[in-house]
Swiss-Prot record:
The keyword Amino-acid biosynthesis does not apply. GO terms for molecular function: mRNA binding; structural constituent of ribosome. It holds the Pfam family Ribosomal_L13. This is Large ribosomal subunit protein uL13. The keyword Zinc-finger does not apply.
Amino acid sequence: MATFSQKPAEVVKKWVLIDAEDLVVGRLASLVANRLRGKHKATFTPHVDDGDNVIIINADKVVLTGKKYTDKKYYWHTGHPGGIKERTARQILEGRFPERVLEKAIERMIPRGPLGRRQMKNLRVYAGPNHQHEAQQPEVLDVAALNRKNKGNA
């Protein structure tokens, strides 16, 4: 029997809705990254975008374990000499775009390259409880019920 290799035309994508309220960032990001890549499917093929479309709501209510809320730093560089900047997870979560903490965690778990960028386009993250994808009839995935450690103690 030959190894199965899926073609892009054969891909069937589902829509999945996840409520991130009180969920641990890293555990949620790991699960979502696998969903976006399609590794949860028996038809997984490394060079094909086989993952599901994932919608995450309440991304502003995620939980960071330990002292990461105050101590974890996100760095970027402006491109100018001495242009290294940093911001803590607390500053981002209390700032204008709190969903970026979760987006960055997921983005850094996806392989870099053209396929990874395409798979990241299948992710929609919203800070509040509302989203505009009701027409896709997303299937609700209860991440907290999968493992007791997925839910934060907050």
